[in-house]
């Protein structure tokens, strides 16, 4: 009985790998026929260098109006890093990048919010691969294929419920470690844990930005772009302000 179960699991894993590899090696024009909606190429998304440059007066005023006291002191100016990050407001499942990050639950079997949206856009093949991963611990991350998504891969991470800085920081670090290990050069993050998990939005953004800045300081040659993807207007406002501190122009 045990041997039969092992063989069945092994067979399912092999089938899942075949399906994943089929999408990973598929020519781009052919893969685009499998997308379930619109897509945004990496080249169509402004770098922070250009985003800020196109709207500098409004963004500076916004920072002054919303932050009478800065939550952190501005980081040193490094123009090359400003071209490695982007701020995008919209649907993360539309991004044609190497990987998008899924704010998943411990089961990795889908849920509400961005988790459900990613599973719907990726198709049932994603769920089948996730079933083989035996879940994921809070603060950890695991990699799957992207299937019908414009993104090649999905990095699933489980954020903490409530304000637990070490665990949230671990989510971002683990995702970036996977990206570096797997030669994933463009990656998009949602706002992890800020929805029903209740992490305060500004506190979560500070951790995300600090972790990304630190990673880029040490690995900028291995990363083409890191995208902060917001959906709620409040998150967009927070990132528009705080990115001026972590990735200042002058």
Where are the language model's segments positioned?
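Macrodomain-like recognition of ADP-ribose-binding/processing modules
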Residues: 1-250
């Amino acid at each position: 009985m045990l041997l039969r179960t092992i063989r069945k699991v092994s067979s399912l894993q092999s089938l899942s790998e075949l399906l994943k590899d089929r999408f990973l090696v598929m020519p781009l024009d052919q893969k685009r026929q499998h997308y379930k909606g619109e897509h945004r190429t990496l080249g169509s998304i402004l770098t922070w260098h250009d985003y800020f440059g196109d709207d500098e007066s409004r963004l500076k005023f916004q920072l002054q109006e919303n932050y009478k006291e800065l939550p952190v002191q501005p980081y040193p100016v490094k123009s090359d890093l400003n071209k490695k990050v982007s701020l995008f407001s919209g649907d993360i499942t539309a991004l044609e990048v190497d990987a998008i990050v899924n704010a998943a639950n411990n089961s990795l079997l889908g849920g509400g919010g961005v988790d459900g949206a990613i599973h719907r856009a990726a198709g049932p093949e994603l769920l089948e691969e996730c079933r083989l991963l035996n879940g994921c611990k809070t603060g950890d991350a695991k990699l799957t294929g992207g299937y019908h998504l414009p993104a090649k891969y999905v990095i699933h991470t489980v954020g903490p419920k409530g304000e637990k800085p070490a665990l949230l920081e671990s989510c971002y670090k683990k995702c970036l470690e996977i990206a570096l290990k797997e030669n994933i050069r463009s990656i998009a993050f949602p706002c992890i844990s800020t929805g029903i998990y209740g992490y305060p939005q500004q506190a979560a953004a500070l951790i995300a930005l600090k972790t990304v800045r630190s990673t880029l300081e040490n690995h900028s040659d291995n990363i083409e772009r890191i995208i902060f993807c917001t959906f709620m207007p409040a998150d967009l406002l927070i990132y528009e302000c705080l990115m001026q501190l972590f990735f200042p122009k002058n």
